[in-house]
């Protein structure tokens, strides 16, 4: 899903990965003391404000900072609509301002995580258009959508490549494409492609981004939905293509359920999900994280 309230990134380490070393080492050191907290679109908009309406080019406004006195460790941004050549993403955030937010957050010592909700390249619908189960197959080499998706991928790479620090060095980011792929709500999800097709999509995408475009400063993160995690093992593209494993797990208020009951159920289920994720991460020697979570509307102060 698209994080609507907030994203909380809890980074835990089971072993070191190979790239980029400085970011992985930082995550590892933090995991031994205090987990990192992340907030989606933190510098872009908040309660009754929007960076697009501000003259503050340093991107200093943050709801988290207003409440806690500090910026979140991790800033989440989404590249949906970059593939279409638009100036703003699917949330209405200007891509130029997003890039500046990433640079400012990095300069303050923060970490950037990027997701991507690409439109359905077959139907022209949104990422949530799962009406055609041939899309991934048609994107793969030999398919009629292959060239189109390569152009889309190059547009993603162009934006990521623009993220340079004040010394012109590439800013490292946690990169989380094709997420919640064990669910059925995205065109790359479990109801729209086979495990083999999904893994081939990941391999193809990775090859273009890393080997063809040379974007090495990426921590590749994969994150299934917690509700369909039994499908994760067969839809895992391989250790050489993944640097971090995550899971997206949200809080919901079921019909007839009190807020207190929902809160208790969420705490219990989160512990269960993280225990499962830890086991998978240890098996593959990867760091792991709670990559998306939240409660829409924040109707519970706890």
Language-model regions, residue ranges each:
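Substrate-binding cleft of extracellular glycoside hydrolase catalytic domains
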Residues: 80, 84-208, 215
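Glycoside hydrolase catalytic-domain groove-lining segments
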Residues: 229-231, 235-299
């Amino acid at each position: 899903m698209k994080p609507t309230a907030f994203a909380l990134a809890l980074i835990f380490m089971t072993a070191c990965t190979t790239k980029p070393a400085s970011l992985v080492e930082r995550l590892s050191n933090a995991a031994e003391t205090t987990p990192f907290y992340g907030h989606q679109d933190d510098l872009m908009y908040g309660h009754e404000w929007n960076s697009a309406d501000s003259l503050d080019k340093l991107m200093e406004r943050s709801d988290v900072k207003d409440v806690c006195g500090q910026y979140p460790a991790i800033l989440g941004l989404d590249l949906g609509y970059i593939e279409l050549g638009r100036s703003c993403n699917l949330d209405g955030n200007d891509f130029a301002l997003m890039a500046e937010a990433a640079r400012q957050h990095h300069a303050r010592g923060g970490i950037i995580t990027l997701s991507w909700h690409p439109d359905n390249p077959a139907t022209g619908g949104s990422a949530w258009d799962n009406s055609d189960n041939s899309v991934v197959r048609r994107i793969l080499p030999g398919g009629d959508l292959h060239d189109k998706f390569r152009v889309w991928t190059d547009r993603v790479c162009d934006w990521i490549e623009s993220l340079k620090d004040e010394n012109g060095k590439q800013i490292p980011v946690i990169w989380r494409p094709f997420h919640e792929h064990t669910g059925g709500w995205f065109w790359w999800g479990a109801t729209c492609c086979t495990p083999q097709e999904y893994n081939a999509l990941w391999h193809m995408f990775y090859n273009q981004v890393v080997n063809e475009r040379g974007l090495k400063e990426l921590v590749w993160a994969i994150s299934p939905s917690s509700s369909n995690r039994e499908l994760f093992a067969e839809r895992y593209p391989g250790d050489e293509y993944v640097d971090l494993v995550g899971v997206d797990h949200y809080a919901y208020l079921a019909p007839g359920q009190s807020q207190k009951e929902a809160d208790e159920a969420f705490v219990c289920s989160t512990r269960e999900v993280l225990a499962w994720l830890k086991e998978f991460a240890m098996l593959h020697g990867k760091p792991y994280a709670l990559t998306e979570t939240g409660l829409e509307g924040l109707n519970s102060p706890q």
